[in-house]
């Protein structure tokens, strides 16, 4: 069975288990694809990173450098770009446009220009929503990695190959770049705290445009449900994407110790991807895009329960 056929079979299984495809919130949906790529290219599964984006190719900027991949050197990345299907007469032109855009967005993750997040090879695929056929777009590869290059040409005959030299920088340049990136990340000021119900619906958001946060910062927040009651949470900043800052719950005051009553929080690896795909206005800094009721309206908070540095805004 050919490499592409194995990928198509795995992607068909993925769609069967996760009808939302690349927008699914599952963190394990790509496991079989990762295994196939690992076996085909003769590298470890931990050296293969698989991701995807729905409709917006520019989101690969976020996908390649998210979570544990940030500032990490990994052997290979695989990206699926999912878009609505088109008539056969438009297919060739669409593939060309998608390929060019995907290469432009992805190349900096291969040549070493993107914040230290780097891959020796990047496989780009096009898929149509709800369909299982996989269209190879291009393979981006570090010019000195002859093993990956030869394997790609063997496994996907005729694939467009893009070779890149690795950008060389002095330690001083690297330090300056790191400092600049840290400043850029800390300058984000649009903060969104996302809570998720058991059914996956988002029930609350709070935004604060007067503060800036870094990953790892701890935040105290109170969510008022009526004139006298509130739910107080300790939050940790776990991701900064564009103007979006996402926090994970660390502790919750004045609620029963019952896991069924606790709010479910966004999983940064995949749920954030789906959230951004489903709510594109978040990336434009829009306000008021989420509303709903707070879980446990009977929760009460007294001033004695709050930490000393808590600010009730």
From Swiss-Prot:
It catalyses: Endonucleolytic cleavage of DNA to give specific double-stranded fragments with terminal 5'-phosphates. Keywords: Endonuclease, Hydrolase, Nuclease, Restriction system. The keyword Hydrolase applies. Coiled coil: none annotated. It comes from the Bacteria. One of its GO terms (biological process) is DNA restriction-modification system. Residues 289-313 are annotated as: Disordered. GO terms for molecular function: type II site-specific deoxyribonuclease activity. Induction: Constitutively expressed during exponential growth. Encoded in an operon with ydiS and ydjA. Its EC number is 3.1.21.4. The keyword Hydrolase applies. Disulfide bonds: none annotated. Disruption phenotype: Not essential; its disruption results in increased transformation by plasmid DNA carrying multiple BsuMI target sequences. Triple deletion ydiO-ydiP-ydiS leads to loss of susceptibility to MspJI, which only digests C-methylated DNA. BsuMI restriction activity requires YdiR, YdiS and YdjA. A P subtype restriction enzyme that recognizes the double-stranded sequence 5'-CTCGAG-3'; the cleavage site is unknown. This is Type II restriction enzyme BsuMI component YdiR. It comes from Bacillus subtilis (strain 168). The lineage of its organism: Bacteria, Bacillati, Bacillota, Bacilli, Bacillales. The gene is ydiR.
């Amino acid at each position: 069975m050919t490499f592409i056929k194995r990928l198509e079979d795995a992607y068909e299984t993925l769609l069967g288990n996760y009808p939302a495809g690349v927008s699914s919130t599952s963190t394990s949906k790509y496991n079989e694809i990762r295994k196939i790529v690992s076996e085909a290219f003769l590298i470890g599964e931990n050296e293969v990173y698989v991701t995807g984006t729905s409709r917006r190719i520019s989101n690969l900027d976020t996908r390649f450098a998210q979570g544990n991949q940030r500032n990490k050197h990994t052997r290979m990345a695989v990206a699926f770009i999912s878009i609505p299907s088109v008539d056969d007469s438009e297919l060739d032109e669409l593939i060309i446009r998608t390929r060019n855009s995907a290469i432009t967005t992805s190349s900096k993750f291969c040549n070493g220009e993107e914040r230290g997040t780097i891959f020796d090879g990047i496989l780009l695929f096009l898929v149509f929503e709800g369909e299982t056929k996989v269209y190879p777009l291009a393979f981006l590869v570090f010019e000195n990695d002859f093993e990956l290059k030869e394997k790609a040409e063997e496994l996907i005959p005729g694939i467009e190959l893009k070779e890149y030299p690795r950008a060389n920088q002095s330690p001083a340049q690297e330090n300056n770049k790191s400092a600049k990136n840290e400043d850029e990340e800390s300058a984000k000021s649009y903060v969104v705290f996302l809570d998720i119900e058991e059914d996956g619906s988002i029930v609350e958001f709070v935004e604060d445009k007067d503060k800036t946060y870094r990953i790892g910062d701890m935040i105290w927040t109170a969510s008022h449900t009526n004139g006298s009651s509130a739910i107080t949470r300790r939050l940790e900043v776990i991701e900064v994407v564009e103007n979006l800052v996402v926090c994970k719950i660390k502790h919750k005051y004045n609620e029963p110790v019952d896991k069924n009553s606790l709010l479910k929080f966004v999983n940064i690896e995949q749920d954030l991807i789906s959230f951004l795909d489903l709510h594109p206005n978040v990336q434009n800094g829009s306000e008021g895009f989420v509303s709903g009721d707070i879980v446990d309206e009977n929760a009460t908070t007294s001033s004695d329960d709050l930490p000393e540095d808590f600010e009730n805004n």
